[in-house]
From Swiss-Prot:
<comment type="similarity">
    <text>Belongs to the ATG23 family.</text>
</comment>
<dbReference type="GO" id="GO:0006914">
    <property type="term" value="P:autophagy"/>
</dbReference>
<keyword id="KW-0813">Transport</keyword>
<dbReference type="GO" id="GO:0015031">
    <property type="term" value="P:protein transport"/>
</dbReference>
<comment type="function">
    <text>Required for cytoplasm to vacuole transport (Cvt) vesicle formation and efficient autophagy. Plays a role in ATG protein retrieval from the pre-autophagosomal structure (PAS) and is especially required for autophagy-dependent cycling of ATG9. Also plays a role in regulation of filamentous growth.</text>
</comment>
<dbReference type="GO" id="GO:0005737">
    <property type="term" value="C:cytoplasm"/>
</dbReference>
<keyword id="KW-0072">Autophagy</keyword>
<dbReference type="GO" id="GO:0016020">
    <property type="term" value="C:membrane"/>
</dbReference>
<protein>
    <recommendedName>
        <fullName>Autophagy-related protein 23</fullName>
    </recommendedName>
</protein>
<keyword id="KW-0653">Protein transport</keyword>
<feature type="coiled-coil region">
    <location>
        <begin position="32"/>
        <end position="108"/>
    </location>
</feature>
<keyword id="KW-0175">Coiled coil</keyword>
<keyword id="KW-0963">Cytoplasm</keyword>
<feature type="coiled-coil region">
    <location>
        <begin position="183"/>
        <end position="234"/>
    </location>
</feature>
<keyword id="KW-0472">Membrane</keyword>
<feature type="coiled-coil region">
    <location>
        <begin position="274"/>
        <end position="311"/>
    </location>
</feature>
Amino acid sequence: MLNDILVEVAEKTQLLESLIIPHERALTESDYSDQLENIRAEISATLNSLSNLNDLLISHDGPLRTEISSLMASKSKLKKINMKELTLLNEQETLETLRNDSSNLESSRPGFTTQQQQSITIASSYRHELQKYLDLVDVEKTSLNTNKLADNSKISKEDVENSDFNFNLKRYEKQQSILHSALTVNEIEIKKLETLLKEFRKDNNFIRDELKLINSNLKSHEDLISDELKQIDESRYAIMQSIGYSGRNEQQSSILDSIVKLSIKKPDIRTLIQERIEEYSNLLNFIDMKLNGLDQMLQEYKSRKSEWAEKSILWSQCLALISELEVTVRDQLSSAHTVGSEISPDQIKAQIKKFLTKLNKLLDESDLEDVVYSLVRNEVNSLNVALDEMNQMPQIKNDISDRESIHNPSFKLISKSPPKTGFSSENVSYKLNNTNIKKD
């Protein structure tokens, strides 16, 4: 909307400037005199439009203030999404670190420190019984020696008849008792170890399940971060479009693309963060520049408010004086017609001089030196030329018929010179024919 109004202001200003020559031509050349009133009306309408447009621009809810408010809102939003984006990128960096740490743990598992270790004491009392057995029996005579076991697998009749057999039975009995005791304790301790191993396996499964859960949560969090970064990227791009920022490199990937590429190219995410900080800084500087420009424009159009009022007043007063002069001369001609008396050119010249004085006073009191001043000066120059021509005229004799009615009489010079009185065809006129004045 702001651009449309500024374009309209420029077009109206150009139109006003373009009316200077047609206005002067309508005042000085008979071929264009019939356009004078239309040109004057167009000048008035253009001045009124420019004044209204200026008021619209500086109004409380006008486009300038609206644009300033919009830029301030964009600046505030950019600051918020900048902080949010940098936070998300730092989180993304943390996730990247966690992924790297997880990969390193798979390939190299560091040992635990002493403080991290939890000692588990395992009792092994069956070995005491086992050692007693080994002390009684030579290792060579145990099952560890497979050859000896094969040799002793059978007992001969001679062994039974041997006097030492009973002694050996008692020895076997003792050995058997020791082994039963060791076996009982051993099986109990195995059950304890199996229970401990079962707990270890349960812990192992729990740890694996927790790792899966954590990795799943990390993946979900990473996906959420990526989605938020994408939304931020879209919001930033929308703001850039709305403020007319063209500094965005179209070749540059979006944040989401950059994050996705982290897993491929493995760039330093710190570099990406620095790029975002720089980009936001450029955006904020651009907004500040626009805000400064709009603020200067607002102050400029505020100062123009009184200027446009002065221009409109000057032009309106000029037209009012011209109209008053035309009415005065028309009334004089009408009065002369009514009484059938003669009218002296000096009377008309006196009125022209009187109104020229008023018009010149308007120009002298005005500080304007622009288009409107030139337009009023055209009117003044036209009256001056008319006055000079009237000074060169012979005496005029009233020759108006009583049967003729006065209907918008106008001044016209029927001579070699074009009309230069500044009076339009809708206003007072006189006809020079030696010494006679006739109503058209």
